[in-house]
């Protein structure tokens, strides 16, 4: 089975896949990373894992995940099925690259607008030639809600 882990600004999201089907998904605080990972690995026969993180990835996380037979750390050097035309490609968040790669895989040869509403709201555009053209980032729903009540 495959394990996909995303370390975001606020939460860690993980999902166990069998082929293209999500078997189970987990959401937890990063402080519980090792306990949750141990639980997932005990419960499922994980043979492949990919990790993306909006933060610098901790070395102890990598050491633990590299025990999985096939492990990939998604970063700016990972080959993805799109051409990144962003003006400063090394500053583009890895979470946004992951979403763009997913859009290209799910909707090949189509223009795609990806909207992700998490701690921040991001908007990213991929054209029908699988070229990432850029996007925008703005405060998330919670910050917007707080701002409405504050001002």
Question: What do these predicted regions represent?
Answer:
Residues 1-9, 15, 22-112, 127-151:
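Nucleotide/phosphate-binding catalytic cleft detector across ATP-hydrolyzing
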Residues 115:
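Divalent metal-binding pocket/active-site signature
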